[in-house]
Amino acid sequence: GPMGPSGPRGIPGPPGAPGPQGFASGPMGPRGPPGPPGKNGDDGEAGKPGRPGERGPPGPQGARGIPGTAGIPGMKGHRGFSGIDGAKGDAGPAGPKGEPGSPGENGAPGQMGPRGIPGERGRPGAPGPAGARGNDGATGAAGPPGPTGPAGPPGFPGAVGAKGEAGPQGARGSEGPQGVRGEPGPPGPAGAAGPAGNPGADGQPGAKGANGAPGIAGAPGFPGARGPSGPQGPSGPPGPKGNSGEPGAPGSKGDTGAKGEPGPTGIQGPPGPAGEEGKRGARGEPGPTGIPGPPGERGGPGARGFPGSDGVAGPKGPAGERGAPGPAGPKGSPGEAGRPGEAGIPGAKGITGSPGSPGPDGKTGPPGPAGQDGRPGPPGPPGARGQAGVMGFPGPKGAAGEPGKAGERGVPGPPGAVGPAGKDGEAGAQGPPGPAGPAGERGEQGPAGSPGIGAPGPSGARGERGFPGERGVQGPPGPAGPRGANGAPGNDGAKGIQGMPGERGAAGIPGPKGDRGDAGPKGADGSPGKDGVRGITGPIGPPGPAGAPGDKGESGPSGPAGPTGARGAPGDRGEPGPPGPAGFAGPPGADGQPGAKGEPGDAGAKGDAGPPGPAGPTGPPGPIGNVGAPGPKGARGSAGPPGATGFPGAAGRVGPPGPSGNAGPPGPPGPVGKEGGKGPRGETGPAGRPGEAGPPGPPGPAGEKGSPGADGPAGAPGTPGPQGIAGQRGVVGIPGQRGERGFPGIPGPSGEPGKQGPSGASGERGPPGPVGPPGIAGPPGESGREGAPGAEGSPGRDGSPGPKGDRGETGPAGPPGAPGAPGAPGPVGPAGKSGDRGETGPAGPAGPIGPVGARGPAGPQGPRGDKGETGEQGDRGIKGHRGFSGIQGPPGPPGSPGEQGPSGASGPAGPRGPPGSAGAPGKDGINGIPGPIGPPGPRGRTGDAGPVGPPGPPGPPGPPGPP
């Protein structure tokens, strides 16, 4: 006999273990001094649109509409005399069109069928593109300022590690769970059907193919390029004011300085406190008229003094000691999201794994709730061709009726009942932070006051010391002063408050890849999972090649009569036979039976794609966002209404400024103010003089870590302690077993995009502080005692993979989601394999012809059917006698279209014939397109603590002491 079919494909061997990975780069050098703050980066690119939601299952088919009333049949024509064929009668007029039936109600959804036998595992698709790089983390709060250390020399780049040798062949892992069956691709073009071949002899079964050789281990992919760093986040809100410095010792009287040029008119200050009743002083010379200040509280009547002589201005006193640094300000808002990093180089294609063992049949799940009417699904696959019935006796040829017109499309049925509300799913992983809004513009500066009138008068005598005024706004920090000499070692200071945790160190160098672990024992079989939701019906595959015809089966008993079929198209007119002998003209005969059903015509071409469906309903609003961080302290309220204007008194001489008072305790935090509207942009004020830097304080010892207490009320901000000593690295934990991959959840509805909040108002710039002398460096403190154990250390390197866990149960099917927007057409899938050709059964006897029912509404166009099989050639009939030519009769009136009788009952199925010869194996399908980029993965573990960074720049100087 001929050669048997090819054996099944061998199981691919297990993949080889990848070699160890070399270092991507050398060790990181010491951290350099912090650079100047960068400008805000441009807005990040808009996120990619989410993939469209899954298509809902098609709704149940509505009940068939009530058929319309049949049209009035045409007039019955007289039968012509038999003779030569008369002229063909015209078709009768069509009956009135029936009204469309009312749409039927949706049927209840049927129960889920038993789970089918799993098919062969498909080839793995090409690896998808690398996931987008996650957003950069938020900028941490700045640590306490310290002296600037010298920048260390840059480290040498480490040598690239040599490529490791390939590891030994790993043991075969336990078989994985059954993969989710992929959706079939769209149908390919139908090939032309070949002629039917002669039935071949039964082939011998082919020998089983040898197992395929194990695949070669793929080379490790190159590490993806590091994405650009995100822009620097905006600076945090300013910290609270520091305590004022102690007043300095009064300086000795200096020489009179030269008279300075009059300065620009300052901004009107807030009203001062009420003054005490002044003593009677010497009468002063009338000075120039100054700018009227804000009305203060009215003081008691002072005695009129005599004018005194001009006093000599004293020398400038030394700067007071530096005040304690203020507490650290709240953590700044996270910076804008960085641009997505460049996609990494796609890794090498992995080795095809061995197919998993088929899982146990799942139990039938409970019927799901009735879903909403889905969009019309793709056309289903063509049904299996029925067995041919026994050819009936040919009936007399009827008059050809006019082909009917297609009925109009029925009215769409009402939407189905809304299913019950779905339960809230588990909260998904936190999404990446959205892009930060643009920074608000700075408000416009108010107009400057009008300049004073009059010439400057001589300096007056030194007045008595006034009440301390309110503390002015702290000026900008000045440049760092020269470092003073080291002082004598001081006594041990008191234990300081525990410092705030330092900034997170830079990420460490990734360690070498760990060795592949030994395969664990195979887990126990999982319990049968619940039946999953039925997938969307795939498109029709291309028709397979025609198989060899099978042996003719034996005739079986007649089957029951089938339902009345739809009216078929009129058959082709038969070839005229030879004329018979002329007979005598007989009486008009009865109406003939309708002709036999003609061969079905070729199916029409596939129609154009319909218009896209309507857009789905708008999703529910997204969840309420987290409460934002408290805003900065509100601006100072405006002054109260001015009192009644008194009579202008004589302008007094300007007294020396009093010393700064001690700062009072901070008041309780006020209520959160409402966000005001965006103010006009202010003009940039003049830059103040930079103050000199004071000496840095000695670092205190690290405090012990206390147990967390209950949240108390917000207290007054305290002074920050020195930076604590970094804790020891924690013990590396044992890596847990890797869980199996869960089934993908239904994508939730998209939330509404957040709106940008209004920009806060810009504060006024304070006056510049005076330049103080360089301070004396304090003595270095002693090393503190060892601190408490630090926070949990960063995770160690990746451990060996544990054994594969048992397969989890399939979760219950969720309610169908709302239909999404129409998706883009998918790619062309691989061509399916040819199916076996069905057997041709014997034809059953022809049943009686029944009445024709009323024509129902036209259904939707079905898929193109397979080309029918060529029937067996019938025996040639006996040549009849040549008849006499008859007299041509007059043409009869148009006859009414004959009604088609019901189809005969299908004959019984014959015995299964021997299998045909195996067809040629189909070509391997092309790899599927890469899937969409998955959602961002969970946040990675915290890296090891980096080296302690250099101390920050010195803080701003304290307020000046009294002269």
Swiss-Prot record:
<feature type="compositionally biased region" description="Low complexity">
    <location>
        <begin position="897"/>
        <end position="930"/>
    </location>
</feature>
<keyword id="KW-0272">Extracellular matrix</keyword>
<feature type="compositionally biased region" description="Low complexity">
    <location>
        <begin position="638"/>
        <end position="654"/>
    </location>
</feature>
<feature type="compositionally biased region" description="Low complexity">
    <location>
        <begin position="384"/>
        <end position="403"/>
    </location>
</feature>
<feature type="compositionally biased region" description="Low complexity">
    <location>
        <begin position="555"/>
        <end position="569"/>
    </location>
</feature>
<feature type="compositionally biased region" description="Pro residues">
    <location>
        <begin position="813"/>
        <end position="828"/>
    </location>
</feature>
<dbReference type="GO" id="GO:0005615">
    <property type="term" value="C:extracellular space"/>
</dbReference>
<keyword id="KW-0106">Calcium</keyword>
<feature type="compositionally biased region" description="Pro residues">
    <location>
        <begin position="948"/>
        <end position="963"/>
    </location>
</feature>
<comment type="similarity">
    <text>Belongs to the fibrillar collagen family.</text>
</comment>
<feature type="compositionally biased region" description="Low complexity">
    <location>
        <begin position="190"/>
        <end position="229"/>
    </location>
</feature>
<keyword id="KW-0677">Repeat</keyword>
<feature type="compositionally biased region" description="Low complexity">
    <location>
        <begin position="482"/>
        <end position="495"/>
    </location>
</feature>
<feature type="compositionally biased region" description="Low complexity">
    <location>
        <begin position="582"/>
        <end position="609"/>
    </location>
</feature>
<feature type="compositionally biased region" description="Basic and acidic residues">
    <location>
        <begin position="40"/>
        <end position="54"/>
    </location>
</feature>
<feature type="compositionally biased region" description="Basic and acidic residues">
    <location>
        <begin position="864"/>
        <end position="878"/>
    </location>
</feature>
<comment type="subunit">
    <text>Trimers of one alpha 2(I) and two alpha 1(I) chains.</text>
</comment>
<keyword id="KW-0964">Secreted</keyword>
<keyword id="KW-0379">Hydroxylation</keyword>
<feature type="compositionally biased region" description="Low complexity">
    <location>
        <begin position="90"/>
        <end position="106"/>
    </location>
</feature>
<feature type="compositionally biased region" description="Low complexity">
    <location>
        <begin position="129"/>
        <end position="142"/>
    </location>
</feature>
<feature type="compositionally biased region" description="Low complexity">
    <location>
        <begin position="702"/>
        <end position="726"/>
    </location>
</feature>
<keyword id="KW-0176">Collagen</keyword>
<feature type="compositionally biased region" description="Gly residues">
    <location>
        <begin position="296"/>
        <end position="305"/>
    </location>
</feature>
<dbReference type="InterPro" id="IPR050149">
    <property type="entry name" value="Collagen_superfamily"/>
</dbReference>
<feature type="compositionally biased region" description="Pro residues">
    <location>
        <begin position="767"/>
        <end position="777"/>
    </location>
</feature>
<feature type="compositionally biased region" description="Low complexity">
    <location>
        <begin position="313"/>
        <end position="337"/>
    </location>
</feature>
<dbReference type="GO" id="GO:0031012">
    <property type="term" value="C:extracellular matrix"/>
</dbReference>
<dbReference type="InterPro" id="IPR008160">
    <property type="entry name" value="Collagen"/>
</dbReference>
<comment type="function">
    <text>Type I collagen is a member of group I collagen (fibrillar forming collagen).</text>
</comment>
<protein>
    <recommendedName>
        <fullName>Collagen alpha-1(I) chain</fullName>
    </recommendedName>
</protein>
<feature type="compositionally biased region" description="Low complexity">
    <location>
        <begin position="349"/>
        <end position="375"/>
    </location>
</feature>
<keyword id="KW-0597">Phosphoprotein</keyword>
<feature type="modified residue" description="Phosphoserine">
    <location>
        <position position="82"/>
    </location>
</feature>
<feature type="compositionally biased region" description="Low complexity">
    <location>
        <begin position="683"/>
        <end position="692"/>
    </location>
</feature>
<feature type="region of interest" description="Disordered">
    <location>
        <begin position="1"/>
        <end position="963"/>
    </location>
</feature>
<feature type="modified residue" description="Phosphoserine">
    <location>
        <position position="558"/>
    </location>
</feature>
<dbReference type="Pfam" id="PF01391">
    <property type="entry name" value="Collagen"/>
</dbReference>
<dbReference type="GO" id="GO:0005581">
    <property type="term" value="C:collagen trimer"/>
</dbReference>
<feature type="compositionally biased region" description="Pro residues">
    <location>
        <begin position="144"/>
        <end position="156"/>
    </location>
</feature>
<feature type="compositionally biased region" description="Low complexity">
    <location>
        <begin position="849"/>
        <end position="863"/>
    </location>
</feature>
<feature type="compositionally biased region" description="Pro residues">
    <location>
        <begin position="611"/>
        <end position="623"/>
    </location>
</feature>
